Amino acid sequence: MTDLFDYKEFLKTVTSQPGVYRMYDTAGTVIYVGKAKDLKKRLTSYFRAQVANRKTETLVKNIAQIDVTVTHTETEALLLEHNYIKLYQPRYNVLLRDDKSYPLIFLSADEHPRLAVHRGAKHEKGEYFGPFPNSYAVRETLALLQKLFPVRQCENSVYRNRSRPCLQYQIGRCSGPCVEGLVSEEEYQRQVDYVRLFLSGKDQQVLTQLITRMEEASQQLHFEDAARIRDQIQAVRRVTEQQFVSGDSEDLDVIGVAFDAGLACVHVLFIRLGKVLGSRSYFPKVPAGTELSEVVQTFVGQFYLQGSQGRTLPGEILLDFTLTEKDLLASSLSELAGRKIQIQSRPRGDRARYLKLARTNASTALITRLSQQSTIHQRMKELAKVLKLDEINRMECFDISHTMGEQTVASCVVFDANGPVRSEYRRYNISGITPGDDYAAMAQVLKRRYGKALDDQKIPDVIFIDGGKGQLSQAFDVFASLNVPWDKQKPLLVGVAKGSDRKAGLETLFLASEGEGFSLPPDSPALHLIQHIRDDSHNHAITGHRQRRSKVKNTSALEMIEGVGPKRRQALLKYMGGLQPLFNASVEEIAKVPGISQALAEKIHNALKH
């Protein structure tokens, strides 16, 4: 039992209604969140002489306080529980580390609707289709739609400024609604309807309508139109034959689970209207001693009930594990979706084959992850020895990227005991410094990163600075000046200087801003881990810098030309159909723009080319 908490007095005050409880340690940190149909009965079970398992025993020893929130129903309690888990990330709960929203295909409600990739909250008016397991899958689908149905995919800002069609029109991927007379309103809306039907899985309706139109065109002797529609029919048929995998037209999520060596993998197979859209593997954080049933139960709850993810709920969820709270989860999901959602654990036929596939994928992904972790863990141990630390649970690395001091971007990448934590990678746009001053850039990013309150688990054990003694000295100065509530002495600051000719394996490490550095053997596992985090940081920084530089280049190219003000910029973009066509235009073409003289056209052409 716990000496920190007078549970007997507390239990006297607890109601038998449904609700949610939050357990705190001595530091006031939430360490566990749970829900109960009967709060008194559930909380009493924690303080019996014989607790359920080792995890519960460890949890109870750390309880210093319990807060209770009473709810009207058990369904309300379930929803609130998962909201609290997401908010507090308690260390004794199973945690789904998935803070990225799923990509969807968005069909806007504009006069001429556009197709686009969408993530996050559904604020914009229109229709949303998905979810897709990753951005690659959704972009592949958009590229396919562009080949089948010539509906625009350009941004509204580009669409409104066109006076002639773009390249997509020239190659038959867009019908050109931006330019009057290229496509009728009726025909464009018909293609939009085809997209809507196709994304809803109603391929046969699309084919039926196209066949009817082809026959009508042929009867009216419009043979060119009939041939064009015939080609569209053949393209749609090819796609549907390739993608159709089941006679079942319902939406399914199929969830397979594998568990070994304290690590769980949950693999989700997304099936929409008989088509496999893709799949994704998840590795939830599992506290020691947690039962597999709790892992699956909590995963399903967090995956579907944490509403900010923007997921579209399927009509049915298939599991290879029987949930103790299946009915409660199903009713909660049905209430959330506004329609009936079923959870099945003993499917037959095609569903059973899907489940076997999901289970196989989970096992394969788990084997791969365990192999990777074995390597990472070995490297972590070697690095801890080199740096004379007891253990390393979290590392962060910083790098600076710029071109001649312009568009400076700093990156921070994070590794934990299992390797890269990409959801915590960050970029920082650097401003207000002398161009090219890497020391000032490093000082700025470190102040922004660490000059604030941090949770204990977010304080790194090691901070790598990409650079030599100068960069490391800046880091020491920044940390000396920090006035923060957390232990700023905890992180070990390490400078990583590149070797001669920037060759891998010749890096020099510095633990102090003065004195000599030291090198590790080229085959050292510790060095390989340092190279891994350093390279990730470098790539993250340079990618951000290139994106920023490209954006500035494209937006400022015209602004820097003398004699080209806002009105002329607008006229140039509208007449030429965008910035890229303007870059490719000749002097004669530019001179045709209203308000642009021959001399100014030459100046614009020379400025854009050079």
UniProtKB/Swiss-Prot annotation:
Keyword DNA repair: yes
Cellular-component GO terms for this entry: cytoplasm; excinuclease repair complex
GO BP, sorted A to Z: nucleotide-excision repair; SOS response
SMART domains: GIYc, HhH1
Subcellular location: Cytoplasm
Keywords: Cytoplasm, DNA damage, DNA excision, DNA repair, Excision nuclease, SOS response
GIY-YIG domain boundaries: 16-94
Domain UVR: 204-239
Highest taxon in the source lineage: Bacteria
InterPro entries: GIY-YIG_endonuc, GIY-YIG_endonuc_sf, GIY-YIG_UvrC_Cho, Hlx-hairpin-Hlx_DNA-bd_motif, RuvA_2-like, UVR_dom, UVR_dom_sf, UvrABC_protein_C
Molecular-function annotations in GO: DNA binding; excinuclease ABC activity
Transmembrane segments: none
Subunit record text: Interacts with UvrB in an incision complex.
Family listed: Belongs to the UvrC family.
Summary of the function given for this chain in its UniProt record: The UvrABC repair system catalyzes the recognition and processing of DNA lesions. UvrC both incises the 5' and 3' sides of the lesion. The N-terminal half is responsible for the 3' incision and the C-terminal half is responsible for the 5' incision.
Protein name per UniProt: UvrABC system protein C
Organism of this sequence: Yersinia pseudotuberculosis serotype I (strain IP32953)
Lineage: Bacteria, Pseudomonadati, Pseudomonadota, Gammaproteobacteria, Enterobacterales
